[in-house]
Amino acid sequence: MTVYLPDGKPLELPEGATAKDVARALGEGWERRAVGAIVDGELYDLLKPLPQGAKVRLLTEKDPEFQTLFRHTLAHVLAQAVKEFFREKGYDPESVRLGVGPVIEKGFYYDIEAPEPLSDEDLPAIEAKMREILKRDLPLRRFVLSREEALARYRGKDPYKTELILEIPEGEEISFYQQGDEAYGFTDLCRGPHVPSTGRIPPHFKLTHVAGAYWRGDENRPMLQRVYGVAFRTAEELKEYLWQLEEAKKRDHRRLGRELELFLIDPMVGKGLVLWLPKGNVVREELMAFMREEQVRRGYQLVTTPHIGSLELYKTSGHYPYYAESQFPPISFKERGEEEEYLLKPMNCPHHIRIYAYRKRSYRELPLRLAEFGTVYRYEKAGELLGLTRVRGFTQDDAHIFCTPEEVKGEFLGVLDLVLKVFATLGLKDYRARIGVRDPKSDKYVGDEAKWALAERQIEEAAAEAGLRYTVEEGDAAFYGPKLDFVVKDALGREWQLGTIQVDYNLPERFGLTYVGKDGEEHRPVMLHRAPFGSLERFIGILIEHFAGDFPLWLAPVQAVVVPVSEKQEGYAREVAGRLKEAGLRAEADTRPERMQARIRDAEVQKVPYVLVVGEREKAEGAVSVRRRKKGNLGTMPLAAFLEGALREYRERRLEPVF
């Protein structure tokens, strides 16, 4: 057989040759350094047979793909270590049943059914076993079995592997990887790719935690235990990641939500349903006020729609039954003689469409921009719910723009400007855009070919004019139109998808929307969906972690606390707090019978931006002694001067303090 090297040179090899044979043919240096290969654009290990005529580029430990290889093998090492861990506890290793063990961002995991529950306390012992396996430098071997042989290997022992084998299509290769020997090594059903031996894995890894995971993500199936690990090429990368992990725990919005009394999720109210406490509601209302101001300034018209809608509305839109699994079931009153069925609103767009359609529209009315803070409901699986970032009821800063095909670019530019204003106001400086366009090989898309081409071109032109750093992702468009979204990095460098703008040719067609053009004829409008915040709940969860609960003044639930030095100044403290409130600031006087330093410390713990200490001197001079969080004591100033500066900082929505 013939394969081709990166420079185009042919290399003759025996049938069934692998990348290992390529390395051997290129000399001792390559044979020693090679860890894998890129074969016709696909990642291979050194063990998988090469196809005839393949283009082969060998990889070394310096190549970025090396991380994928060793992380995958570490998942197998983890599974082997767990089996050895339970063998030492007196269990048959076969009693440890294995699900799947893929590579994920930063590391790997394995889903395991163990004879007794694993806990985070078990991880150091399992990790030590993994390091032993690396030191043994066990070579990996790849082999293929027939379907019957593969099933015989697991039948009656491991229902999860049996199920996976049964799902492999007829005629497709069923491959296994073995590290070490059959008696004391480990063999797993796997497509690969892997490193050549366990000794090639860098020792810079750590098992992080154990979590529950339903088999195949189905809450009606058995609950397995998912053991997570992270792995890097260097000790420095691992150290940096572990620091980020600890910092992320400190910033966890669920913990800070409790400590700062922002929100709660009460089991009696329901899983995934958020109760906004007074302080959290301040953050929510401030964000909504900011967005409302910006939208009105940009020509949006605000509407309000109900929390439920007729089932027929969602059948027409296609949201039902196509997305029925992620929706609450229909509400029926047929037993009361009511024929109409209802659905908790999963999307705002059908309601906005009916507002557009209630009368004839002219091209002179376009673009028509309808906006709403609309609450919608999705049935997320219980195991997928997570604080504010994955909930069952959430409010979107939703808007739908109805325009002519020629207006798409201008409207896109307008929405981009709004999204970038949001990012700038909140200090989200590190972002990139992704433009999702059609896959030319797919026929799943609806709408006119010429309109698609125009919209894709307009989106790219708008992104370029806005000065965005963007990539074009072929095949990422929805079936009903191209889109643009943003990937934003927070203070810890984590990436979040925000600010999606979606072109839609489908819904105007399904609802028969029209406008009368300049020619007096009826035409089909284009619809744009946009929500810069996305879900307010998720967005606030991200902001809590980005700011570590230390909000800028305009978002801070309590902006200033006035602390009297002694009982003699309590009246003045209340007077100062009253003045601040009258001016529009959120202020409190802390006159509890605690030591002054304890009250100042409590305000710090609650992340209040300003603490105003008042003693006899301040009372006599109509002044305040100002402490700014993270800056300390700023000295004494007239109350009027503080008020003027604080109001400017608040009203201008500044990120940095005035003082």
Curated annotation (Swiss-Prot):
Superkingdom per UniProt: Bacteria
Region (Catalytic), start-end ranges: 252-552
UniProt xrefs under CDD domains: TGS_ThrRS (cd01667), ThrRS_anticodon (cd00860), ThrRS_core (cd00771)
GO molecular function annotations of the record: ATP binding; metal ion binding; threonine-tRNA ligase activity; tRNA binding
Any GO BP annotation: threonyl-tRNA aminoacylation
Residue span(s) of domain TGS: 1-60
Catalysed reactions, as listed in the record: tRNA(Thr) + L-threonine + ATP = L-threonyl-tRNA(Thr) + AMP + diphosphate + H(+)
Subcellular location: Cytoplasm
SMART domains tied to this protein: tRNA_SAD
Cofactor note: Binds 1 zinc ion per subunit.
Family of this protein: Belongs to the class-II aminoacyl-tRNA synthetase family.
Quaternary state and interactors: Homodimer.
Protein name: Threonine--tRNA ligase
Gene, per the UniProt record: thrS
